[in-house]
């Protein structure tokens, strides 16, 4: 069984390796990607195509959207927004219009970052799953931390007011980022993934079914795969979270079942709250967006 100390050392070493990578940042204002950037004749925000180097030198892409006009004296509060499985994310108009700078980040091999790097074989959740050092989510988690590096270094951003927000896979990435980076001041995780792998591995509903099928087809690799996944399981990272966390769950969600989420939530030691919907499955509720924005306003304003 992997100890908490082993997990902490693994991530400390991984963070140290990321810190050695020059971001080689490029930014280009791309107004055509945000057709609603003007309200009437008034420009309300600017969106930049942002490309940077992350863990092991892999290039990743993001949209950086910032309100127009002079920032407040201490800078804009900022939110790192991370995607569901596959990298689908809308531009965060609902956040920027309320005065947040937002980095909409696509981890390696997802969404916009497919232009820079692609998985050679298999799927993300089982990519090198038996090798903790080469597993897909080692790089993906560090891509999120690189996003925090970006925001904390922006002159128009208040580095003391950075949050992370995500749904589904993005919920898992939000929890992981909050656990691995103390610069995160608030986190929102809607129906998070990457939780409680020993239970999740029995699910036959996509995308956890990718893991289930792999372990069924390769039973001789199960022990090694589960030992590797322990380093990436929110169940083992949750106790490292120090910021306020809002979690969303759903009783009839078969994609990310509540039985995978609740044990993680229970291990979070910081201030926390959970919203559980009794009558919805794996879907984004509009009212959860209101709860999430109120959470960010409370801790980032």
Tell where the protein language model's regions lie, with residue ranges.
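C-terminal catalytic histidine-bearing segment of alpha/beta-hydrolase fold enzymes
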Residues: 3, 262-301
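N-terminal cap/lid segment of alpha/beta-hydrolase-fold proteins
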Residues: 21-73
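Gly/Ser-rich "nucleophile elbow"/oxyanion-hole loop immediately N-terminal to the catalytic nucleophile
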Residues: 125-168
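Short beta-strand/loop motif that positions the catalytic acidic residue
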Residues: 241, 247-249
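Hydrolase active-site cap/lid region
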Residues: 175-221, 276, 284
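Cap/lid segment of the alpha/beta-hydrolase catalytic domain
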Residues: 90-96, 101-142, 199
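Short glycine-enriched nucleophile-adjacent loop
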Residues: 151-152, 164-165, 171-182, 187, ...
């Amino acid at each position: 069984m992997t100890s908490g100390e082993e997990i902490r050392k693994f991530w400390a070493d991984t963070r140290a390796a990321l810190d050695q990578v020059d971001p080689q940042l490029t930014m280009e204002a791309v107004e055509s990607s945000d057709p609603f950037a003007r309200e009437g004749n008034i420009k309300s925000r600017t969106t930049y195509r942002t490309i940077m180097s992350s863990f092991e030198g892999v290039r990743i892409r993001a949209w950086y959207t910032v309100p127009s006009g002079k920032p407040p004296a201490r800078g804009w509060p900022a939110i790192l927004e991370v995607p569901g499985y596959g990298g689908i994310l809308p531009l965060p108009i609902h956040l920027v219009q309320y005065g947040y700078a937002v980095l909409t980040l696509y981890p390696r091999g997802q969404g916009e970052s497919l232009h820079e790097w692609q998985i050679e074989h298999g799927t993300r959740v089982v990519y090198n799953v038996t090798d903790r050092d080469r597993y897909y989510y080692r790089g993906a988690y560090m891509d999120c931390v690189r996003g925090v590096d970006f925001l904390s270094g922006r002159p128009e951003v208040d580095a003391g007011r950075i949050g992370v927000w995500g749904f589904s896979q993005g919920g898992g990435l939000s929890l992981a980022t909050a656990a691995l980076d103390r610069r995160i001041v608030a986190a929102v995780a809607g129906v998070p993934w990457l939780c409680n792998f020993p239970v999740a591995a029995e699910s036959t509903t996509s995308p956890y079914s990718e893991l289930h099928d792999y372990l069924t087809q390769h039973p001789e690799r199960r022990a090694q795969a589960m030992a590797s996944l322990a380093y990436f399981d929110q169940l083992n990272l949750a106790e490292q979270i120090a910021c306020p966390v809002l979690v969303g769950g759903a009783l009839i969600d078969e994609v990310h079942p509540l039985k995978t989420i609740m044990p993680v939530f229970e291990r979070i030691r910081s201030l926390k709250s959970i919203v559980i919907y009794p009558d919805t499955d794996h879907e984004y509720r509009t009212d959860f967006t209101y709860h999430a924005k109120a959470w960010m306003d409370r801790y980032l304003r």
